[in-house]
Every structure is written in structure tokens, then in C-alpha cells.
Amino acid sequence: MSQLKTRFERDGYVIVPGFLSPETLTGLRRITATVLDGLDAAHREKFKATGSLCNFGDHPEFAEIVAHPDVLPLLQGLGYDDIRWLAGYLISKPGKAPPLFWHQDWWGWSEEISYRAAPMGIGLMYYLSDTRPENGCLRVIPGSHRRWHPLHDLPDAHGDALSRAEDLQSRAFASHPDEVAVEVTAGDLVIMDSRLLHSAYANTSGAERSLLTLWYLPEFTDLPDGIRNQLHQIFARTDLDIDADKTAPPSPADWPAAARQQVTDLFPTPADHPTERIFQRHPDQARMLKT
């Protein structure tokens, strides 16, 4: 486990081979197929670069993978405790789909804590099929969770134009000499620091490539109040632009009791008092490690 921790802290990601049992993998494939069958063309078009982005808040059937009994021991073995769960997504790239844009998934770069060694968010990426560059495997810039890289200068990677893959000539979609392809076998787990620059190759095969990405929050109560409050809003899905006459979409707190009770202990809670909104997706080069 110490070698796993060393590689994770150095590179910002690590692979745990064969994490899912064959039975669990089969069950997740069945659930995933049902969810994907229910997607309409508008969803696929809106998330063309990712393929799909199905929030677990809408799908209590994923409760068991959130509460997988080996997850907390794994994260604790890496040296992390006081763990909460933030969100989960079914991300599935259909055959003949474009690449995913380069991005990182942290937004608290205005805060000094974002430049520490330990992550604020840890992504657990469960792959439901074998992956390689030809079918859209993950690609990463090792070490970019703590070191400045030219790709940090890209525009905000979570806008509509990139999500819809409107300009595939943009360097946000291009290969980079520093990239590493992360090829896995179905059932493997990729652990990733939320600050790591990553994307995915185009899926040039004819088959769907699916994964489940779950975000966990280590040392949660040690986080600054502003970050805690923002994380709680993301969990509750109240951080979205919602019309005044509409309510927020469902969150795991709204799941049926049988599903909710499996994960309640992992729910993030807000700080004791309100704070100003923290949201800065671009790191400060001067505060990152020098290469």
C-alpha cells in the first residue's frame, strides 16, 4: 500500500487491478445498460465529448457501488480518513465518438489548501470494459495535480462549446507530448486526484465504452468552511442555475430509504455558517511546484 500511495502522490493517479468482482461487474453493466437505454438524443448531443454524464442523484440503483465495502479501507490505506462522498456519474462514450477535452476537476484554486500534497477530492473510476486508445481510454498528464503545465492555460473546460465538441481543432482536444495513456481491464479501478489534468481519446471503435466516476472527499472536516459549503451545494445539486419557479434536481438525500441508508454516513455537511462562494478553476502558477 505504501508504494501505491507514493505513486498516487507523485503522479496524481494510480491503477488498482481487478478491484471489482466478476459478479459486481456484471451487475453494474446491467444497471448501466438500462440507464443508457433511457437517454435521449438531446443528452447525447449536450455531452458529446463525454458521451453521457448521468448524475447518480437521479439513479439510486448505484447506491451499492457508492458504499462498496472495500472503498473506505482502500482510501484509509492510502493515508486518508474522515471521508465523505460528493457525487457519482455514469460516463459512457459511444462508438465513433470524439475525444474528451483536457481539464481538471478542481475549482478551489483561490485557496492555499489547494496547493498542498494531499488531495481535496479523489475520483474512483470504475471501468466496465477493457480500454485502449482506440476505444477512448483515459489519458493524463502525470504530476500536473501539483505542477504547472501549459494545458492549465486552456479556457474553462466545462463550458457548453467544449461539452458539445463544437471545435475539434481546439488544442483542448489535441494530443500532447506529455500525455500518458491509461489502459485498463474491465473491473480495474483508477484512483485520481481531482486536480490532475486528464482527458480521453476518441472512441474510434464501434462499441460503447462505459465507466462510473465517484468522487470522495478525504479529511473533510479539515477543509475551509467556504470549500465545505461549496462541496455541500454540489452534493445537494443546489449549485446549478435553477429558475425561480423550479426546484433543484434530486440528490442522494432524496433517494428511497433503502438506498439512502447505505450511504447516509458519507454525506458531506455544510459548515456552521454561510460563506462567500469559492469558485476558481485556474491554478496560480506561482504557487504550484516548480518542475
Describe the predicted segments one by one.
Residues 1-11, 16-116, 227:
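Non-heme Fe(II)-dependent double-stranded beta-helix
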Residues 38, 196-291:
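Non-heme Fe(II)/2-oxoglutarate
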Residues 48, 103-108, 112, 164-175, ...:
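Short, surface-exposed loop/helix-turn segments at secondary-structure junctions
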Residues 93, 141-148, 215-221:
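Short edge-strand/loop segments of extracellular domains
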Residues 98-104, 111-113, 134-140, 149-153, ...:
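A short secondary-structure junction signal
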Residues 112-133, 183-186, 191, 215-218:
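Short, conserved beta-strand element in jelly-roll/cupin
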Residues 131-197:
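Double-stranded beta-helix
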